[in-house]
């Protein structure tokens, strides 16, 4: 059954939801979007918070995980642990271009250490699979765990907004690290294993490192400090949208 995009009064909703609790926002999203509601996870450092929060209210929600093929061993093990414990309805998506084929065609893009190469990498390994997942699952709205304290771009986000063809809903937008820690502790939920090694954010093995004293924020530990966003949470330009449909991917 096709899910129809509902036209919402975003300015009013953004004001109403600005002071709502995470649970209230998730409940609102479930009631508003019904089977058209999905969530995404990276199985990162604090992933258990959103997974527990959302599945406590919407138990069988489709959980999209983009497997880049370059995740650390510990991330795959952490994903398996949380999937079993929380009984996740996990939907795994990958690029149709295998890591070996991508490297043969473009080289090790992350080693080129320029933004253009990193953007191409993210487009192939993350953005295209996510857009395909949202389309195949007929998503109207997408729950994600972005927080304002993570990057400069995220400071200006709203609890609900339109990105491309889907609404994006951010229940823990105003949470800080202390609130995350308290939630994990209260519900006996695990951090990613790399937390104990000084990581505050983890993605692919080649583009993540522990937090250093000179880092201004946690996302400086990603992408060699050249960029803060992988592209999943940025508005698509017309050119980016067109490239997602390219058979070259």
UniProtKB/Swiss-Prot annotation:
GO molecular function ontology, one term from the record: phosphoadenylyl-sulfate reductase (thioredoxin) activity
Enzyme type, top EC level: oxidoreductase
Function recorded in the entry: Catalyzes the formation of sulfite from phosphoadenosine 5'-phosphosulfate (PAPS) using thioredoxin as an electron donor.
UniProt-listed GO biological process terms: hydrogen sulfide biosynthetic process; sulfate assimilation, phosphoadenylyl sulfate reduction by phosphoadenylyl-sulfate reductase (thioredoxin)
Keyword annotations: Cytoplasm, Oxidoreductase
EC number assigned by the record: 1.8.4.8
Gene: cysH
CDD domains noted in UniProt: PAPS_reductase (cd23945)
Pfam families reported for this sequence: PAPS_reduct
Pathway: Sulfur metabolism; hydrogen sulfide biosynthesis; sulfite from sulfate: step 3/3
Keyword match Mitochondrion: no
Matching InterPro entries: PAPS/APS_Rdtase, PAPS_reduct_dom, PAPS_reductase_CysH, Rossmann-like_a/b/a_fold
Catalysed reaction equations from the record: [thioredoxin]-disulfide + sulfite + adenosine 3',5'-bisphosphate + 2 H(+) = [thioredoxin]-dithiol + 3'-phosphoadenylyl sulfate
Primary localization: cytoplasm
GO cellular component: cytoplasm
Residue numbers annotated as active site: 230 (nucleophile)
Family: Belongs to the PAPS reductase family. CysH subfamily.
Location of this chain's protein in the cell: Cytoplasm
Protein name as catalogued: Phosphoadenosine 5'-phosphosulfate reductase
């Amino acid at each position: 059954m096709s899910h129809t995009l509902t036209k919402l009064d975003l300015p009013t909703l953004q004001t109403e939801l600005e002071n709502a609790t995470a649970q209230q926002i998730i409940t609102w999203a479930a009631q508003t979007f019904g089977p058209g509601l999905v969530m995404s996870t990276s199985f990162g450092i604090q992933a258990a918070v959103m997974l527990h929060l959302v599945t406590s209210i919407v138990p069988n929600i489709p959980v999209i995980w983009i497997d880049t093929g370059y995740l650390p061993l510990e991330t795959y093990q952490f994903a398996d642990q949380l999937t079993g414990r929380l009984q996740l309805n996990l939907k795994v998506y990958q690029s149709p271009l295998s890591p070996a084929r991508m490297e043969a065609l473009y080289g090790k893009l992350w080693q080129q250490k320029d933004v253009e190469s990193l953007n191409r990498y993210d487009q192939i390994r993350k953005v295209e699979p996510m857009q395909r997942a949202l389309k195949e699952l007929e998503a109207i709205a997408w729950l994600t765990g972005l927080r304002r304290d993570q990057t400069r771009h995220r400071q200006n986000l709203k609890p609900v907004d339109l990105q491309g063809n889907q609404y994006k809903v951010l229940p823990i937008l105003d949470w800080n690290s202390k609130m995350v820690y308290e939630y994990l502790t209260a519900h006996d939920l695990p951090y990613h294993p790399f937390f104990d090694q000084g990581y505050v954010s983890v993605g692919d093995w080649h583009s993540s490192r522990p937090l250093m004293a000179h880092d201004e924020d946690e996302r400086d530990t990603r992408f060699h400090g050249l960029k803060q966003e992988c592209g999943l949470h940025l508005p698509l330009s017309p050119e980016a949208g067109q490239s997602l449909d390219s058979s070259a991917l």
